[in-house]
Amino acid sequence: MNRFYLLRFISLLFIANLIFGQTTKLHLVFTNDIHGSIHQIPARFMNPEFGPMMSGGAGAFAYVSELRQEAKQKGDDVLLLDGGNFFQGTPLGTLDGGETIIRWMNQMDYDALTPGLRDFDQGVENLKQLSNVANFPMLSGNLIDDKAGQNPEWLKPIIYKQIGQTKLAIIGLTQDNIPELSFPKNTEGLQFLPAVASAQKQVKTAKLNGADIIIMLAHLGIPYNRKDEFETFLSQVSQGETSVESKGLNAMELAHFVEGIDVLVTGGVAKGYNEPWEDPNTHTLIVQNYGNLSGIGHLELLIDQDTKSISGYEFPTDRGMLITLLQDDILPESEMGETVHHWVKDAKLKAEKQFFSRDTNPKKNAYLKTLKRLSESDRFPVPSLGKPEQLEIVTWNLEWFPAAGDTTLEAAAETIQEWGVDMVALQEIKNINAFAKLMSFLPDHDFVLSKQSSFMDQAIIYRKDVVTFLAQYEPFSFDDYYFAGRPPLMANFIWHYEERQREFMVVNMHLKCCGDGLYRRQKSLEQLHDLLAQYIENGNENIIVVGDWNDQLTDTGLNQSFTAFLDDPDTFQFATMEISGDTSQASYPKWIVPSILDHILYSKGFFDEQALGGKIQTLRMEEVLGSWELYEEILSDHRPVMWTIPIPD
């Protein structure tokens, strides 16, 4: 009798499936913009002072492992993808070119990733080597090997997976304007084909090979304020300003132009959305997670095995598809947690050891071509400021560099060349490729560029004939919330002239503006003071701290950001204190009250030199260019600030 009822029950299930169709579930799990951050840190974005601990890569490992076990029991499938920018951002990622992060991804059992903009930071050969380490494919269908004339052998354009009776294609795409955003050497040997045409070709290929559902893995990004940005895009399309041939399209724009993509997993912007974006034209779903592995994305796709299509989707929580990796909610898997802890500890020690090691061979950037500036003669009467017997350093926030494209590059190159100063510290470098072009106009100079910043870069440009670069380091990159994702760029140098020489450290930083900026500036400077005081105690007394501090020395009480340094006058002094009350010397004259926001601080190792004749001044560049309007249009809204000190025999 029991057997009779069992057979009848099975028959009813079979009939129901025939009538109603069978629906299976595909758990789409995704990450993007990890930036080498698989360690545990406090969630300061929730509570800057007492942030709950996050579980990091070990928490992600625990979540995905448990999900896979549950899915197996229920007959569901799991797909784990990454949208790029996986290793740049911490020494854990950059010291070995991303190999440690790939080893973690192997343990996570990723199905695929697509390389992002910052994944090219150490060149194509490095990515190729990482593909050999990875137990999963790297995907991109629009990258062509210059020599072979086809997809590089280490990249796959498409992979296929079977989900029940449904064939799934995962196609890869890389941002087609990466060569315009990176150092030329970083993408050497590759052609980046137009995104839309490549995507259309891949979709067609996938369909011809029997794919029922197509998931695209594309490093394109969903911007902040996605609704407003999409409306702007539609307006640009209607006016002919944006089309299928446009370069640098974001994920929403590409999905609007390309039919046949069911889901697009993207990265490149560290802004997560709890609900997918659905294109009103193609109905493509687009998903993007927050960056730095603060969470993991999880969308439950419902697959109709009868129609072999996506019939809907569900969220794993009431909040949506983003799972914040809080330790209180998701405990780190113990063995993985211990492994990551040791990786981080070793990376910190190695990074600091390299910074203080003394290599007799000077470091050079040998991968920049020397170009001539477009203008045949100098446009502006830039004064000569450099003298051989003194050390000069300028700090200059070049707002959203380059603000006016090649015009900015020409003006900045002419200025730096004609100044003739030993060092120029820059902030707000938005486009690294443009910075490379700037340096190609300055063959007598070399540079140090930040490696760990997540929102614009800092650089130190120096004259090769008087300054030798030794090493760089970016402290706090494992926990850079207080520094607004821009950890200080530290670099050790030797200044030399005839028989004189002096070893010293330069710290270039760009502190948080606006919002909770005051609190974060205070905390970041407390951290920096304590670190530099430790360096001085260990015998490194020659330190210069420059940059856009985004605050004034004249503030008082609780509104003062610089208290940690001001309360230690026997160790540190502000060169800019001398001009702090002089509005004619304001580095940011646009404020309601013209202000000095760009400062230079020096440590006790330079006290004697300052007393011998140190000078501080703001450089009134609007007088050089002819007007403030022109200066602001092509260079910056900040004036540069220069400090000079004599270096005695």
Where on the chain are the PLM-derived regions?
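Acidic, glycine-rich loop-and-strand cores that form catalytic or ligand-binding grooves
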Residues: 553, 561-616
